[in-house]
């Protein structure tokens, strides 16, 4: 007789800001709820733009979530009866999140994560490249460029209406007042302050 294994998997939803990542995460998790599956959602404490204890899309759709400070906080929860685990804004967690989502999948959970693939400079946003590599399914969403209306794959950070400098901090949580979607042609990263002084 053959043995059957109940194995979980990882689904990764990624793209620029305003591409609908949280919206898609909420949609997939709600389908699990409709199917009478036990669903638990986590979000990083740093993301308090709309609500501390809910995943909220830019369109206002929301789902209850557990606010956590570190990726290890996920393992402190009793997940023994949980079928589906959602994690929003995964790029804000430490690199240990990669091992944690793999462990959750190995324990039979369906893990659905969402987060940015690139930072405001257009560079890979760690640990998303590793999450994408270990995922069984990767969905890359695009927004619409705020300048020309074409497909947008990048996130433009604006400080007082001007492009952020290359040496600005990577993590700065904001919404539409400090970020907008841009295509490759209209994505701008200003030179560092020291480069400007040399000119």
UniProtKB/Swiss-Prot annotation:
Positions annotated to bind ATP: 15-22, 88-91
Q: Which residues bind Zn(2+)?
A: 145, 148, 183, 186
Q: What is its main location?
A: cytoplasm
Is Metal-binding one of the keywords? Answer: yes
Subcellular localization is given as: Cytoplasm
User: Keywords for this entry?
Assistant: ATP-binding, Cytoplasm, DNA synthesis, Kinase, Metal-binding, Nucleotide-binding, Transferase, Zinc
Which pairs are disulfide-linked? Answer: none
Which residues act catalytically here?
89
Q: Which SUPFAM superfamilies match?
A: Glucocorticoid receptor-like (DNA-binding domain), P-loop containing nucleoside triphosphate hydrolases
A biological process (GO) of this protein is: thymidine metabolic process
- Coiled-coil intervals: none
Extract the Pfam families matched here: TK
Q: How does it assemble?
A: Homotetramer.
Q: Which HAMAP family match?
A: Thymidine_kinase
Report the protein name in the record: Thymidine kinase
